[in-house]
Regions:
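Charged, low-complexity intrinsically disordered tails and linkers
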Residues: 1-39, 44
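Alpha-helix initiation/capping motif
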Residues: 6-12, 55, 68, 86
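Histidine-centered active-site/metal-ligand motif
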Residues: 28-36, 48-50, 80-84
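A broadly conserved detector of short glycine/acidic/proline-rich loop/turn motifs that flank catalytic sites
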Residues: 31, 55, 89
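Intein-associated homing endonuclease modules of the LAGLIDADG/DOD-type, together
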Residues: 39, 58-60
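Short glycine-enriched loop/turn motifs at secondary-structure junctions
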Residues: 42-46, 75-78
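Short, surface-exposed ligand-recognition loops at beta-strand->loop->(often short) alpha-helix junctions
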Residues: 50-56
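Short, compact, well-ordered microdomains
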Residues: 60-100
Length: 100
């Protein structure tokens, strides 16, 4: 399975969700509100991203990139789910996928 992956800036959330609902994987730059907080014993550092997609596609992309399916945040008002990604791994994704 080849997945189309695209990076979206903060203000492009509508475009990111539409892209993900269409079957792509959207790497969306999120706000850094949680910088310094902890979750499950991990300290969250900026930058923060959401990796958004239809669950099946997101699981496939996650497996290719070392992310576990149980880390996926559930679908809520939309049909897409997402991973929360932060810190050095988020920096790697930005470096790889950001057009700038």
């Amino acid at each position: 399975m080849r997945l189309d992956v695209r990076y979206f800036e903060r203000r492009q959330i509508k475009e990111a969700i539409a892209f993900a609902e269409g079957g792509g994987i959207a790497i969306h730059r999120n706000f850094d509100h949680y910088h310094g907080s902890t979750i499950r014993g991990m300290r969250r550092e900026r930058p923060f991203l959401h990796v958004i997609g239809l669950r099946e596609n997101l699981e496939a992309w996650g497996r290719l990139h070392g992310l576990r399916p149980e880390w996926i945040q559930p679908e809520k008002r939309r049909k897409v789910a997402h991973y929360d990604v932060f810190g050095p791994y988020a920096e790697e994704l930005i470096a790889k996928w950001s057009p700038s």
